[in-house]
C-alpha cells in the first residue's frame, strides 16, 4: 500500500498537469452543494441557479493594521458601497461586509465580502442574483464563508 501511495505521489509531482492549482491560494474555498465553479479568463464565479458570486484574489503588500486597510479598500472596490460589519475571523485575518443598493432600481444589487490576511492577499467575494433575490445571494455567500480555510483551518469564527 505504501508503495502505491509513493508511486502516485511521484506521478503527481512528475506531471504537474495532473495537479490542480488553487486560484485562491493561500485561501481554500470549497464549492457548496448545488453550486459550480465557472472559470473565465482571469475570473472565477460560483454559480447556483441565478445567483453568482465572483471571487477575486489580489496579491498585495501586507498592512500593519488590516482592519483600517479593509475600511479603505471597501470604497476603493465600490465607491457606492455601504460598509456593514466586520466578521469574526481567525487571528491575523479580518473580513468586512458591504452592500450596494438599488443602483438599477431593482433593490439590492450586490453583497460583498472583503477578506484580508497577514500575507496581504485580498480575497473579494462579490455576489448578486439575476432576479434580485438578496436571500439567495446571502445563502451562497454564507456557504462559501462557512467552508473558507487557510491550511485547513477555518477562517470565519462561529460562536
Predicted feature locations:
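Sec/Tat signal peptide C-region and signal peptidase I cleavage site
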Residues: 15-21
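Residues embedded in well-ordered secondary-structure elements
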Residues: 6, 24, 35, 102-103, ...
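Sec-dependent N-terminal signal peptides
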Residues: 4-15
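N-terminal export/targeting and maturation segments
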Residues: 21-38, 43, 47, 52-53
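Surface-exposed amphipathic alpha-helical segments
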Residues: 26-35, 125-159
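Conserved polar/disulfide-associated segments of primarily extracytoplasmic proteins
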Residues: 40-133
